[in-house]
Amino acid sequence: MVQLGQKDLLVDCQGNWGNILTGDGAAAPRYIEARLSKFALDVVFNPKTTEWKLSYDGRNKEPITLPVKFPLLLAQGVEGIAVGLSSKILPHNFNELCDASISYLRNEEFKLYPDFQTGGSIDVSKYNDGERGGAVKIRSKINKVDNKTLAITEIPYGRTTTSVIDSILKAVDKGKIKIRKVDDNTAANVEILVHLAPGIDCLIGRGARCQ
């Protein structure tokens, strides 16, 4: 339920539902509230697109099936393991899915690639149109604040600011990089400030990206 709410698509949330950027967990169930969004009521639970039956106590009606008018699986993303085979469907951009759906219905060619709430840049040269064996490479976005400070403003999908900072500190412990400290100012947007050690100059260009 929390994962659905964090997507801001099917569920309207109230309370502390956690933060996918920092990895902070949601509050206990008794402290959070949810309701179906207008999008969910129209696209998933629309009475004109499915058959309904009485609920177990006869007071309400519930859908027999849920045929969705929108490629929801591609928007949400999902992963799992069955019969020893791991499968992952990456999330996609809402607007791009709508455009791709229209092109598909018109029998027109289109390109559709994954998109992520956490931002970052993606290399789709080996994506293989999302079929078996395909792979993508996702990178953070790093900006130069000044000669002594770097700002990480986007992080790879599946990572959190906490895990990114941990990887930076491990690199420091191994002597791979030299920094003075790391500040996590993330709220609605990612902002990790990396302060370089004395004697270390920042040579990265503004808007550059690293893995």
Write out the residue ranges for each language-model feature.
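Catalytic phosphate-handling regions of large nucleic-acid enzymes and associated NTPases
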Residues: 1-133, 193
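C-terminal interaction appendages of subunits in large macromolecular complexes
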Residues: 78-81, 85-211
